[in-house]
């Protein structure tokens, strides 16, 4: 049997950047550096960073007041940044630039009077972060999706979770 390896392989640039930011924070400030959500969905990388002093948490409230935190590549809703300010946390935002682009597009389209449908996986950190940017409706499974009661004349924009494959997106639209 032949095995073909796709090129390129590995992490996307946004994930590499996020990992680098955690390592830079650890090198510059020393441990502990808290990481809001796994920096990447890879247990080997997470374990390696934790061995260097990174502490992964799921909620901002788990982080001691005044500590340093890196928000993951997946992005976070504005409420997380507000909670971090209230706790006087030193925030390093490692949100992937492509995810930030989706966040900015969501805000722009809502500002233009459009409705937004987000295609993504319910509960995924990126989806949570994106849905926190503006009012939108999530399509996770088109078989279970109930169309919102929107005026048929209202313009609609469809955005997608950046980590979805083309096939996943096609199945949802």
Task: Locate the predicted segments by residue.
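The feature marks the mature, well-folded catalytic cores of soluble enzymes
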Residues: 1-173
């Amino acid at each position: 049997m032949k095995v073909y390896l796709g090129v390129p392989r590995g992490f996307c640039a946004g994930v590499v950047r996020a990992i680098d930011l955690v390592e830079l924070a650890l090198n510059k400030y020393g441990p502990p550096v808290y990481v809001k959500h796994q920096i990447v969905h890879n247990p080997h990388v997470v374990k390696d960073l934790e061995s260097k002093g990174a502490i992964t948490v799921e909620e901002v409230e788990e982080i001691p007041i005044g500590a340093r935190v890196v928000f993951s590549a997946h992005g976070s809703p504005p409420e997380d940044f507000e909670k971090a300010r209230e706790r006087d946390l030193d925030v390093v935002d490692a949100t992937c630039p492509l995810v930030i682009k989706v966040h900015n597009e969501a805000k722009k389209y809502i500002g233009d009077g459009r409705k937004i449908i987000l295609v993504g996986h319910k509960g995924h950190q990126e989806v949570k972060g994106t849905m926190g940017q503006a009012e939108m409706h999530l399509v996770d499974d088109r078989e279970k999706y109930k169309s919102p009661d929107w005026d048929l004349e209202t313009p609609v924009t469809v955005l997608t979770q950046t980590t979805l494959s083309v096939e996943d997106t096609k199945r949802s639209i």
